[in-house]
Design a protein with these regions (language model features):
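N-proximal low-complexity "stem/linker" segments adjacent to membrane-targeting elements
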Residues: 1-24
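A structural signal for isolated positions on well-ordered beta-strands in alpha/beta enzyme cores
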Residues: 4-6, 30-32, 54
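A generic secondary-structure signal
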Residues: 22, 71-75, 104
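Short acidic/polar active-site loop segments enriched in Thr and Asp
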Residues: 29, 82, 111
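Short beta-strand/loop segment that forms part of the nucleotide-sugar
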Residues: 29-37, 57-58
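Active-site-proximal specificity loops/subdomain of glycosyltransferases
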Residues: 41-86
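Catalytic-site signature of metal-activated, phosphate-bearing donor transferases
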Residues: 66-70, 95-242
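The conserved acidic donor/metal-binding loop of glycosyltransferases
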Residues: 88-93
C-alpha cells in the first residue's frame, strides 16, 4: 500500500515546508506538486527538501486547479499509488483515530473518504465549527477525478471521520490581503462564473480598510484551544513551532 499527496502551490513560502514535512511524517510515500509563477521562494524551498517530491512548473496565469489536480492524480495513479490525498499548502491532513495516515489507510475498507475541514487562527486555535464543504481522499482507480478544491470526487459514496483536515489559511493581516488578491487575480473566469472561489471573490474590490474589517470578523469567529495534530518533531523552526 502506498500513498501519494497532490497539490497546487502558489506563494506559500511561509507554510509550505511545514505542510510538506507534516504529510511525510504521517507516512505519505510521494508527493506531486504543480507550482505556479510564485513571487516568493516557494519553488526553492520545495526543491531544497530531501524528500520524494515530483515538481511541475505551472506557467499559466490562470489558476486551473481542478485540471492540474486531476493531472497529478493520474500521474500518481500511473506510478502505482493506491491512495491519493489532495491538499492545499495551508492544510494539515490527519487521522481522527490518532494513528498515522499511513497506518489508518492500510486498514481502511472504504474507497472514498470525506474530511471535515476545520479552520485555524493559529497553530493552537481551532474554530469551533467545521467549514461547510468537505474535502476528499480516496483509493485510486483509473479515471477518478475531483472537483475544484477537491471538495468531491467521482467515486460513489463517502465515509466521514477517518481523516480530517486543519486549515491555517491566513497567517496575518498582510498575508490575508496578499493571498486573497492573488487568488482573485488568478482565478479561472470559467470557474468563477460557476460560483467557485466564492470564499475569495467575496472580498473582490475591497479597500485596505474594508479588508481590515473583514480580517477582524474572521478573527472574531469562536475558537477553542486544540493544536493541529502533527507528528513533526519539535525544534525544526517551522511555522507554529516555538
Amino acid at each position: 500500500m502506498s500513498i501519494a499527496a497532490v497539490a497546487m502551490v502558489l506563494n506559500e513560502a511561509d507554510i509550505i515546508e511545514t505542510s510538506i514535512r507534516h504529510l511525510f511524517a504521517e507516512g505519505i510515500d510521494e508527493m506531486y506538486l504543480a507550482v505556479g509563477e510564485c513571487d516568493d521562494n516557494s519553488w526553492n524551498i520545495i526543491e531544497s527538501l530531501d524528500l520524494p517530491i515530483h515538481m511541475y512548473h505551472d506557467t499559466d496565469e490562470v489558476w486551473h486547479q481542478a485540471a492540474w489536480t486531476n493531472e497529478l492524480i493520474a500521474r500518481a495513479g500511473t506510478d502505482g499509488h493506491e491512495w491519493i490525498v489532495p491538499f492545499d499548502a495551508d492544510e494539515f491532513v490527519y487521522a481522527t483515530n490518532s494513528d498515522s495516515i499511513a497506518d489508518t489507510l492500510a486498514d481502511c475498507p472504504h474507497d472514498n473518504l470525506l474530511l471535515h475541514q476545520w479552520g485555524h487562527h493559529s497553530w493552537g486555535a481551532r474554530e469551533v465549527t467545521p467549514r461547510t464543504q468537505p474535502k476528499v481522499a480516496f483509493r485510486y482507480s483509473f479515471g477518478v477525478t475531483v472537483s475544484m478544491g477537491a471538495h468531491a470526487c467521482s467515486l460513489p459514496g463517502g465515509q466521514w471521520d477517518v481523516l480530517d483536515i486543519r486549515e491555517w489559511q491566513f497567517l496575518s493581516f498582510d498575508h490575508f490581503c496578499k493571498k486573497v488578491r492573488t487568488r482573485i487575480a488568478t482565478l479561472d473566469p470559467v470557474e468563477r462564473a460557476r460560483g467557485n472561489g466564492w470564499h475569495m471573490t467575496r472580498f473582490d474590490g475591497k479597500s485596505d480598510e474594508e479588508m481590515r474589517t473583514e480580517w477582524e470578523a474572521i478573527q472574531a469567529i469562536p475558537t477553542i484551544a486544540d493544536p493541529i495534530p502533527s507528528r513533526l518533531p519539535p525544534g525544526l523552526g517551522l511555522v507554529g513551532q516555538a
